[in-house]
Amino acid sequence: MASKGSGNGSRRPRRGRRSFPIKEDAHARELRAVTAQLNRLVALTAARMPTLDHPTFVSSRKCAKGYTYTSLDVRPTKTEKGHSFGQRLNLPVPVSEFPKKKVSCVQLRLNPSPTFDSTVWVTLRKLPLGYSLASESVFKLFTDGLSAVLMYQHVPNGIQRDNKIIYDLSPVGTEIGDMSEYAIIVYSKDDTLEDDEILIHVDVEHQRIPSATALPV
């Protein structure tokens, strides 16, 4: 009887030990399920983030075959009424290290701050490197008819519907090395344009370069 009792007692720990693998398997399955869910979320998030293959802001279309785009932000500084702000386009390294790659188009998209309550004219012009971007030199660029002008004005909801303009540069054979000759000109028409009242988002669509997969967007 004693031996039978001791035998029963000896089996209980074994039953307990046999249950550990079951608990471990359940934990492992739960961990795998959570990991798979996280991986799906990461993949979904990555798919929605801008990449070099992501549709550009250019009319919500994808880049032309063999092309990608580089984005820049231009923030006009304080500009008095009747005066202008100018800034040349300088593409970052390593894009600028491939000056012979073709540029197909440039898009300018305006994002106003909540305090913006004026009217601005914006244009993109190719100007010699020695050309002065001072106000007295550039106003005529808005009236000579040689380049399209985006006229952007304050609206009650804060964002004008037509807030972007596209410049097709492919007919003139523009290359990356030519971009420093292009300047964004902003004319403050009705009031003083304060610092950071407006942001100009610039998308430059150009041929892919060898290290394109490593470029930030």
From Swiss-Prot:
Report residue spans for region: Disordered.
1-24
Places the protein is found:
Virion
Keywords, A to Z, come to:
Acetylation, Capsid protein, Disulfide bond, Ribonucleoprotein, RNA-binding, T=3 icosahedral capsid protein, Viral nucleoprotein, Virion
Listed Basic residues bias regions:
11-20
Question: GO terms for CC?
Answer: ribonucleoprotein complex; T=3 icosahedral viral capsid; viral nucleocapsid
Please give the InterPro entries that the UniProt record associates with this protein: Cucumovirus_coat, Cucumovirus_coat_Asu_sf
Top-rank taxon: Viruses
List the SUPFAM superfamilies hit by this protein, alphabetically: Positive stranded ssRNA viruses
Q: Which residues carry this modification: N-acetylmethionine?
A: 1
Which Gene Ontology molecular function entries are recorded, alphabetically? RNA binding; structural molecule activity
Where in the chain are disulfide-linked cysteines found?
A: 63-105
Gene3D superfamilies cross-referenced by the UniProt entry: Cucumovirus coat protein, subunit A
What job does the chain carry out?
Capsid protein. Probably binds RNA and plays a role in packaging.
Domain notes from UniProt: The N-terminal arginine-rich stretch does not seem to be the major RNA-binding region that allows formation of an infectious ribonucleoprotein complex.
Q: Which family does it belong to?
A: Belongs to the cucumovirus capsid protein family.
Entry protein name: Capsid protein
What is the taxonomic lineage of the source species?
Answer: Viruses, Riboviria, Orthornavirae, Kitrinoviricota, Alsuviricetes
